[in-house]
C-alpha cells in the first residue's frame, strides 16, 4: 500500500522537473508574461514578462501522478482523494481565468472581485456538499460536521454551518497562499513543506485507523478518517510536484505559478485539512500563510482606522525587502519560519495521539 505514496511523489517530481520547461517555452512563445505593479519594490520590475500560470504544471503533474500510482499498484481511487483533487483543479481553474484576463488586458488585476469570489464560492460549496456524502462501511464520510484540531472534538456544527466553515477555510487558505506568492519560490517551498506534513499525517492516521482497532496497541487513540492513506497519496503527489516546480520557480524564477497555482495549492491544503480532520491544525502547519495574511489585515485595518501603516508595505515579505533584505534572504528566512511551524504542528499532532495512551 505504501508504494502508492512513493510512486505518486516520485512521478509528481519527475513530471514537473521535465514538464515545466516545456510549459515555459509554450507560455513565452504566446507572450503570456507576468504584469508587475509599478508601486512594488524596484527589484521586481526586472521580472516583468516572466511566464506565469505555471500552476498548470503542478496541477496536471499531481493529477497524473495520483492516477499513475493507482495504475501501477492496482489500487482504486477513493472519494476523499478525488474530492481534494477536484477542489484543487476547480480553484486552479478560477485562478487560470484570473491570470488569463491579466495577460490579455495587460494589467495587474484580472477577474473582477465579485466574479472571482463567485467562482471560489461555487467550487467551495460543491466540495463541501459532496464531502458530506459517500459514507464508507464504517459510516465515515470524507468530511465531518464536527470541528477538528488534531482530530474531531465534541462540537458538532451541522451541515449548513459546516458548508460555511469549509468555505471560510478554502477562501482563507487559497488567498493566504496567493498573498505569499510574491517572491521567487516562497509559496512553492512553503507549500512543499506542508504537503510533506500531510503525507506523514495520512500515513499515521492509516496505521492508527479505527478500522484496524483490534490490531492496535492503543485503540483508544484511533482515528475515524475516511481514506487516510489515499490522502497521503494526494499529499505526496503535491509535495513531489511542488518540489520539482521549485527548481524552475526559485530565484531567479523562470516561471511564476500565478493565481492558477496559488489558488489551487490553497484549495488542496484546505481540502486535506478538512478530510484529515485537522481543520484548526492547518493554521499552524501553514503558519507562514496565516502570518502573511494577518500582515495584510493589520495593514489595511490600521490605515482605515488611524490613517497610518504598520508595515512599509504589505504583504509582510515586501516590508522586509523595503528594509534592505535581499529577496533570497527573505525567502530563506521565511522558509525557516515555515519549517518551524511544520515541526511544531506535527509535534502537536503526535502529542494529541500520545495523550490518549
From Swiss-Prot:
<keyword id="KW-0133">Cell shape</keyword>
<dbReference type="GO" id="GO:0008963">
    <property type="term" value="F:phospho-N-acetylmuramoyl-pentapeptide-transferase activity"/>
</dbReference>
<dbReference type="InterPro" id="IPR003524">
    <property type="entry name" value="PNAcMuramoyl-5peptid_Trfase"/>
</dbReference>
<feature type="transmembrane region" description="Helical">
    <location>
        <begin position="280"/>
        <end position="300"/>
    </location>
</feature>
<feature type="transmembrane region" description="Helical">
    <location>
        <begin position="52"/>
        <end position="72"/>
    </location>
</feature>
<dbReference type="GO" id="GO:0005886">
    <property type="term" value="C:plasma membrane"/>
</dbReference>
<comment type="similarity">
    <text>Belongs to the glycosyltransferase 4 family. MraY subfamily.</text>
</comment>
<feature type="transmembrane region" description="Helical">
    <location>
        <begin position="115"/>
        <end position="135"/>
    </location>
</feature>
<dbReference type="GO" id="GO:0071555">
    <property type="term" value="P:cell wall organization"/>
</dbReference>
<dbReference type="GO" id="GO:0009252">
    <property type="term" value="P:peptidoglycan biosynthetic process"/>
</dbReference>
<keyword id="KW-1003">Cell membrane</keyword>
<feature type="transmembrane region" description="Helical">
    <location>
        <begin position="228"/>
        <end position="248"/>
    </location>
</feature>
<dbReference type="InterPro" id="IPR000715">
    <property type="entry name" value="Glycosyl_transferase_4"/>
</dbReference>
<feature type="transmembrane region" description="Helical">
    <location>
        <begin position="334"/>
        <end position="354"/>
    </location>
</feature>
<keyword id="KW-0132">Cell division</keyword>
<keyword id="KW-0460">Magnesium</keyword>
<dbReference type="GO" id="GO:0051301">
    <property type="term" value="P:cell division"/>
</dbReference>
<keyword id="KW-0131">Cell cycle</keyword>
<feature type="transmembrane region" description="Helical">
    <location>
        <begin position="186"/>
        <end position="206"/>
    </location>
</feature>
<dbReference type="GO" id="GO:0051992">
    <property type="term" value="F:UDP-N-acetylmuramoyl-L-alanyl-D-glutamyl-meso-2,6-diaminopimelyl-D-alanyl-D-alanine:undecaprenyl-phosphate transferase activity"/>
</dbReference>
<feature type="transmembrane region" description="Helical">
    <location>
        <begin position="4"/>
        <end position="24"/>
    </location>
</feature>
<keyword id="KW-0808">Transferase</keyword>
<keyword id="KW-0479">Metal-binding</keyword>
<keyword id="KW-0472">Membrane</keyword>
<feature type="transmembrane region" description="Helical">
    <location>
        <begin position="77"/>
        <end position="97"/>
    </location>
</feature>
<dbReference type="GO" id="GO:0046872">
    <property type="term" value="F:metal ion binding"/>
</dbReference>
<comment type="pathway">
    <text>Cell wall biogenesis; peptidoglycan biosynthesis.</text>
</comment>
<dbReference type="Pfam" id="PF00953">
    <property type="entry name" value="Glycos_transf_4"/>
</dbReference>
<feature type="transmembrane region" description="Helical">
    <location>
        <begin position="153"/>
        <end position="173"/>
    </location>
</feature>
<protein>
    <recommendedName>
        <fullName>Phospho-N-acetylmuramoyl-pentapeptide-transferase</fullName>
        <ecNumber>2.7.8.13</ecNumber>
    </recommendedName>
</protein>
<dbReference type="Pfam" id="PF10555">
    <property type="entry name" value="MraY_sig1"/>
</dbReference>
<comment type="function">
    <text>Catalyzes the initial step of the lipid cycle reactions in the biosynthesis of the cell wall peptidoglycan: transfers peptidoglycan precursor phospho-MurNAc-pentapeptide from UDP-MurNAc-pentapeptide onto the lipid carrier undecaprenyl phosphate, yielding undecaprenyl-pyrophosphoryl-MurNAc-pentapeptide, known as lipid I.</text>
</comment>
<keyword id="KW-0812">Transmembrane</keyword>
<keyword id="KW-0961">Cell wall biogenesis/degradation</keyword>
<dbReference type="GO" id="GO:0008360">
    <property type="term" value="P:regulation of cell shape"/>
</dbReference>
<feature type="transmembrane region" description="Helical">
    <location>
        <begin position="255"/>
        <end position="275"/>
    </location>
</feature>
<keyword id="KW-1133">Transmembrane helix</keyword>
<keyword id="KW-0573">Peptidoglycan synthesis</keyword>
<dbReference type="InterPro" id="IPR018480">
    <property type="entry name" value="PNAcMuramoyl-5peptid_Trfase_CS"/>
</dbReference>
Amino acid at each position: 500500500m505504501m508504494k502508492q505514496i512513493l510512486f505518486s511523489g516520485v512521478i509528481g517530481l519527475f513530471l514537473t522537473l521535465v514538464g515545466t520547461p516545456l510549459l515555459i517555452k509554450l507560455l513565452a512563445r504566446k507572450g503570456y508574461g507576468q504584469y508587475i505593479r509599478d508601486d512594488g519594490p524596484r527589484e521586481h520590475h526586472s521580472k516583468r514578462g516572466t511566464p506565469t500560470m505555471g500552476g498548470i504544471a503542478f496541477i496536471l503533474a499531481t493529477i497524473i501522478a495520483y492516477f499513475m500510482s493507482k495504475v501501477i499498484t492496482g489500487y482504486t481511487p477513493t472519494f476523499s482523494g478525488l474530492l481534494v483533487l477536484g477542489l484543487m483543479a476547480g480553484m486552479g481553474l478560477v485562478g487560470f481565468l484570473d491570470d488569463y484576463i491579466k495577460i490579455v488586458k495587460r494589467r495587474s488585476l484580472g477577474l473582477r472581485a465579485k466574479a472571482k469570489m463567485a467562482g471560489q464560492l461555487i467550487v467551495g460549496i460543491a466540495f463541501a456538499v459532496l464531502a458530506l456524502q459517500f459514507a464508507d462501511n464504517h459510516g465515515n464520510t470524507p468530511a465531518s460536521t464536527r470541528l477538528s484540531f488534531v482530530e474531531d472534538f465534541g462540537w458538532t456544527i451541522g451541515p449548513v454551518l459546516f458548508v460555511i466553515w469549509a468555505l471560510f477555510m478554502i477562501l482563507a487558505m487559497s488567498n493566504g497562499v496567493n498573498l505569499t506568492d510574491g517572491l521567487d519560490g516562497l509559496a512553492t517551498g512553503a507549500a512543499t513543506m506542508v504537503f510533506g506534513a500531510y503525507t506523514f499525517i495520512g500515513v499515521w492516521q492509516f496505521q492508527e485507523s479505527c478500522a484496524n482497532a483490534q490490531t492496535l496497541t492503543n485503540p483508544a487513540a484511533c482515528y475515524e478518517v475516511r481514506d487516510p492513506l489515499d490522502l497521503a497519496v494526494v499529499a505526496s503527489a503535491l509535495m513531489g510536484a511542488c518540489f520539482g516546480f521549485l527548481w524552475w520557480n526559485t530565484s531567479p524564477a523562470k516561471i511564476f505559478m500565478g493565481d492558477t497555482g496559488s489558488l489551487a495549492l490553497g484549495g488542496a491544503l484546505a481540502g486535506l485539512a478538512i478530510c484529515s480532520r485537522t481543520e484548526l491544525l492547518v493554521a499552524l502547519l501553514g503558519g507562514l500563510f496565516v502570518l502573511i495574511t494577518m500582515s495584510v489585515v493589520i495593514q489595511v485595518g490600521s490605515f482605515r482606522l488611524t490613517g497610518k501603516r504598520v508595515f512599509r508595505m504589505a504583504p509582510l515579505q515586501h516590508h522586509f525587502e523595503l528594509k534592505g533584505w535581499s529577496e533570497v534572504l527573505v525567502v530563506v528566512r521565511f522558509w525557516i519560519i515555515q519549517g518551524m511551524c511544520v515541526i511544531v504542528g506535527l509535534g502537536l499532532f503526535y502529542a494529541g495521539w500520545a495523550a490518549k495512551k
